[in-house]
Amino acid sequence: MGRVLQKKKNRSSAPKIKIKSGKSKSGKKKINVLGNSIIAQNWDKKLTLAQNYRRLGLATRLNAPTGGVEKGVSAGALNNISSLATKGKTAAQIQPSEARVERDPETGKILRIIQPDQAGDDGTIEVAGHKRRRTNPLDDPLNELSDVEDSTLRDTGASTDVVSALERQAAAEEERVKKRKPRHQSKREEEWLQRLVDKYGDDVPAMVRDRKLNPMQQTEGDIRRRLRKWHGNKK
């Protein structure tokens, strides 16, 4: 026979208390992107994480992009490259575009290819009765924002005020770490290490297994670090 109170809880419609986990639905650890005060002050809640990092001059991924990501080309480089001119053996990067093909109505052979600039094309197409830019047919405002930000960051070398502030903060933290005094071993810790060495010598795994001399169950790596420091202080 089960417990009556537990059965009532199972039948109840009241929501059960769930312990907050430090992991996301995908199983990865949750990261507080606003943990840094400088980033929190310059964060735009209307943009996604990738767009915010791009705007601030930061990288969302440390690894190189893989699959489905095309290397961007700055607007200045595109203006200097002609689709009809080649410079030696260097391969020119040609951006994909559209053109009209004029065919013979009888044979179907291609007579000529009309480029958009030759046909007086203004770079727009008609979508659902509305004229849209050929590069942005869905009229997505974030697409325009991303293009502008990408070209700006590439031209300026991704150097922003936020990056400079973060670099100064990191340099100050590094100086504080250098000024910290190293931890000195106490007299009791030195006596404890001396007893371990007198009994086991260099056999650190045996020191770990000793319940009397190692009541706090210090790990093998921890004891090795303490011994290394202890031997260094004796010299």
Curated annotation (Swiss-Prot):
Tagged with keyword Thylakoid: no
Iron-sulfur as UniProt keyword: no
Transmembrane segments: none
Domain of life from the UniProt record: Eukaryota
Chain spans, region Disordered: 1-28, 120-189, 211-235
Name listed for the protein in its UniProt record: Nucleolar protein 16
GO terms for biological process, alphabetical: ribosomal large subunit biogenesis; rRNA processing
Quaternary structure (record): Component of the pre-66S ribosomal particle.
Family that this chain belongs to: Belongs to the NOP16 family.
One Gene Ontology CC term in the entry: nucleolus
InterPro entries referenced in this protein's UniProt entry, alphabetically: Ribosome_biogenesis_Nop16 (IPR019002)
Location, primary (coarse class): nucleus
Ranges of Basic residues composition bias in the record: 225-235
Function noted in UniProt: Involved in the biogenesis of the 60S ribosomal subunit.
Keyword annotations of the record: Nucleus, Ribonucleoprotein, Ribosome biogenesis, rRNA processing
